[in-house]
Amino acid sequence: VVIILATVIAWLIGSLVTGAGPSWSGLLLVFLFVGLGVIGLLDDGIKIMRQRSLGLHPSGKIIGQVAVASLFALGTLIMPNEFGEYAGTLEISFARPTALTLGFAGLGVGVVLYLIWTNLIVTAWSNATNLTDGLDGLAAGVSIFVFGAYTFITYFQRIQACTQLGANQSTCYSTRDPLDLAIFCAALIGALAGFLWWNASPAQIFMGDTGALAL
């Protein structure tokens, strides 16, 4: 819970101070982050109340993750900004956009494939992080490096944005709200660093499913 609260508060302050948001992309990310955290909180709460290691039934946990991930995915395909950019896209890219798209057989098929792909990523990553949280400081330490990379990537996209004055259109990046995403990732790193101080072996506080599923 402390990781989620610290991250959201720091992101909100950072977004307001810099004028980067709160943006639609940032709000979607917070929704996904908090939504998965709530599922983990329910799981932890059941374990505590029933004094046993079994919390939510696995199928119930997956259903919750699919519901949150699906709403998140649909949210990325609506609400374009003033440049016509969406938080998500059906196009498949590597370092640059390619001619490949999930909508190869029509928009309806593309959206369905996009939902499946998003759910696969969210449920796989969320549960993998939960499994990683088996040693003191492991999940938090690994996540710091992961979100450190995301901070660098999103900030680089911000300074190389196609909407920047004088941007080279052949080398720029057309992504939505990269600065707000960088602020969120940086806020999460700060929250994890503070948490890691008390979670390193021998741990005095624990992440639980609340923090692990959110990450």
Question: What does each model-found stretch correspond to?
Answer:
Residues G19-V30, M49-G64:
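Membrane-interfacial loop-to-helix junctions in multi-pass inner-membrane proteins
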Residues I3-L41, F72-E91, L113-L215:
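Alpha-helical transmembrane segments
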Residues K47-H57, F94-F104:
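Membrane interface segments of multi-pass transport proteins and intramembrane proteases
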